[in-house]
């Protein structure tokens, strides 16, 4: 079937009065930023009690209101999904595309086995693995693919090139890149790849290394318009057997739904503290932040771990997506985020379904190395998304505007108070941060019916110490194009992110030492200083009590998880019920 790549062949959903909506959207963004900045600079206090040393600023009130609205809309979206009576027609053809690069063999096998066990008609589901590399060290991935899908309709091919490295005939080599992308000439490799992808059900392609975007492009381009929907996932993901069905339901529900993402969870959550906190953070991101965005039909980032797109829309912007540049250089990061951006730019809705889920592993150094590239792609796509805010709900403008400036305000607050020469201010700053996080975590615990979600309040400390400097570095190096990670077969040994963490730690510790030095020289015998010392002491006591409580809950949660893993699956007694509520 001929591939359709002309965007004019795809209906674009445009809002009424686009110019007026654009003006209103940008005006709202400017007023919002001005209001938040003014409230912070002037330090206006909505509530103040000198005796109890309590102040509640306008900025804090706005943050509390934001979290409240986010929780309400997310809850409404989850309820709407639960009440939806949609039934999958099982008539749509789906291609499950997997991108792989030197993957851990165990992770890859689990991924492929989960794909094989997918509850979707085999005649309607294709499984395509594209391996980024065709050397001897990459062959093991194809061998695993053959083992898992032995007996299926399998096709494999080792391609010595890729779509953008094969030799163009000399008479065509002088033409522009846009003409090359239309491929008027097709060599034997391209023809073989496209024939396998369109005629076989399970296909594995090894091609010349070119990065994640290159392997994604190969799968998308080779499929052409042969399927209705394209499901993307990474080679370390374990898919739930109903993941495809639930995503197809959403796209079938409304033709204006251009893409939909699923719920990604961490399956090795108790391997380390970082993996445990990541699992809690994943729940919060997907079931609060993304669910809230889905309520307004404008999910700004559908993860590459589990996302489905309408193929006709994807084919329309495929070449533009592949050739995307930033500040004149090609962007090898943010491939999945830019896919979502292109769907939004055409006026289509982007949705989320918590009923479709997948499981991903988490390791500390890899997690740390990914934070800066992820943040960098977020800042880049923010500038792109700003062009399409007017096509969607005003919530998209509001959330994007507040999200981009949040790291700056947090940094300013931290540095100002750390160097304020007041230990009392520092202690109560962190105590208030934990109290706010605890309130949010209690809501998440109630929503998820798991006591362990209370530990999500610890994420605020993790954000301040580890993630905030990564975001600042990402903004300062926004033009940098390297990805910074490697395949899981090799242990990640990139310690560069630790350098930025060291600088940030030095800044915070410097402020703390300065305030302690001033405090040691202070005359605490005066009545005002004596009252401040009293507040400092019970603030420290409250902060220590919080950490003791969180430590106990974490230890109990870990013990309960081990009990559940050792329990017999058929046993359903009161003990197993209490364990499930804890973890």
UniProtKB/Swiss-Prot annotation:
Cell location: Membrane
| Transmembrane residue ranges | 30-50, 53-73, 394-414, 426-446, 458-478, 498-518, 536-556
Pfam families (UniProt xref) = Glyco_tranf_2_3
Keywords per UniProt: Membrane, Transmembrane, Transmembrane helix
- Statement: the UniProt record of this protein carries the keyword Transmembrane helix: yes
Predominant place of localization: membrane
Q: Which InterPro entries match?
A: Nucleotide-diphossugar_trans
An example Gene Ontology biological process: hyaluronan biosynthetic process
Q: Name one GO cellular component term.
A: plasma membrane
**What's the protein here called?**
Hyaluronan synthase-related protein
Q: Which organism is it from?
A: Xenopus laevis (African clawed frog)
């Amino acid at each position: 079937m001929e591939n359709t790549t002309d965007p004019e062949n795809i209906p674009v959903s445009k809002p009424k009065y686009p110019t007026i909506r654009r003006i209103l959207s940008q005006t709202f963004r400017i007023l919002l930023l001005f209001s938040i900045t003014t409230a912070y600079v002037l330090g206006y206090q909505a509530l103040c009690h000198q005796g109890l040393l309590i102040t509640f600023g306008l900025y804090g009130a706005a943050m509390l209101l934001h979290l409240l609205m986010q929780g309400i809309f997310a809850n409404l979206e989850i309820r709407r999904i639960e009440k939806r009576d949609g039934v999958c027609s099982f008539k749509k053809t789906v291609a499950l595309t997997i991108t792989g690069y030197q993957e851990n063999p165990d992770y890859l096998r689990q991924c492929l086995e989960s794909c094989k066990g997918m509850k979707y008609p085999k005649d309607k589901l294709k499984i395509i693995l594209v391996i980024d590399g065709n050397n001897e060290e990459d062959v093991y991935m194809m061998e695993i693919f053959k083992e898992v899908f032995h007996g299926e309709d399998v096709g494999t091919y080792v391609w010595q090139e890729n779509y953008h490295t094969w030799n163009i005939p000399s008479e065509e080599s002088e033409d522009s890149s846009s003409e090359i992308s239309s491929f008027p000439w097709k060599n034997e490799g391209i023809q073989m790849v496209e024939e396998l992808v369109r005629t076989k059900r399970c296909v594995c392609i090894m091609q010349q290394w070119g990065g994640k975007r290159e392997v994604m492009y190969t799968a998308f381009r080779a499929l052409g318009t042969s399927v209705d929907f394209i499901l993307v996932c990474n080679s370390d993901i374990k898919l739930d057997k109903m993941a495809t069905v639930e995503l197809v339901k959403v796209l079938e529900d409304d033709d204006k739904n251009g893409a939909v993402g699923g719920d990604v969870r961490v399956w090795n959550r108790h391997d380390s503290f970082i993996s445990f906190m990541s699992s809690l953070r994943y729940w919060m991101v997907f079931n609060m932040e993304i669910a809230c965005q889905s309520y307004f039909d404008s999910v700004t980032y559908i993860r590459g771990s589990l996302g489905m797109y309408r193929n006709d829309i994807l084919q329309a912007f495929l070449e533009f997506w592949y050739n995307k540049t930033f500040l004149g250089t090609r962007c090898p990061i943010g491939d999945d985020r830019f896919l979502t951006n292109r769907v939004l730019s055409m006026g289509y809705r982007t949705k989320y379904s918590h009923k479709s889920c997948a499981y991903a592993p988490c390791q500390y150094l890899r997690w740390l190395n990914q934070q800066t590239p992820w943040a960098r792609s977020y800042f880049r796509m923010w500038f792109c998304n700003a062009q399409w805010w007017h096509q969607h709900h005003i919530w998209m403008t509001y959330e994007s505007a507040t999200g981009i400036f949040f790291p700056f305000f947090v940094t300013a607050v931290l540095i100002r108070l750390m160097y304020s020469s007041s230990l009392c201010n520092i202690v109560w700053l962190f105590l208030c941060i934990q109290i706010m996080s605890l309130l949010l975590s209690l809501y998440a615990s109630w929503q998820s019916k798991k006591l362990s979600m209370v530990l999500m309040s610890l994420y605020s400390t993790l954000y301040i110490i580890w993630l905030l400097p990564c975001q600042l570095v990402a903004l300062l190096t926004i033009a940098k194009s390297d990805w910074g990670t490697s395949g899981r077969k090799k242990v990640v040994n990139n310690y560069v992110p630790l350098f930025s963490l060291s600088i940030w730690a030095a800044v915070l510790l410097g402020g703390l030492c300065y305030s302690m030095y001033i405090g040691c020289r202070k005359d605490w015998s005066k009545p005002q200083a004596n009252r401040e010392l009293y507040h400092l002491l019970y603030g420290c006591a409250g902060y220590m009590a919080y950490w003791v409580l969180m430590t106990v809950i974490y230890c109990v949660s870990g013990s309960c998880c081990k009990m559940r893993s050792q329990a017999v699956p058929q046993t359903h007694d009161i003990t197993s019920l209490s364990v499930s509520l804890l973890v």
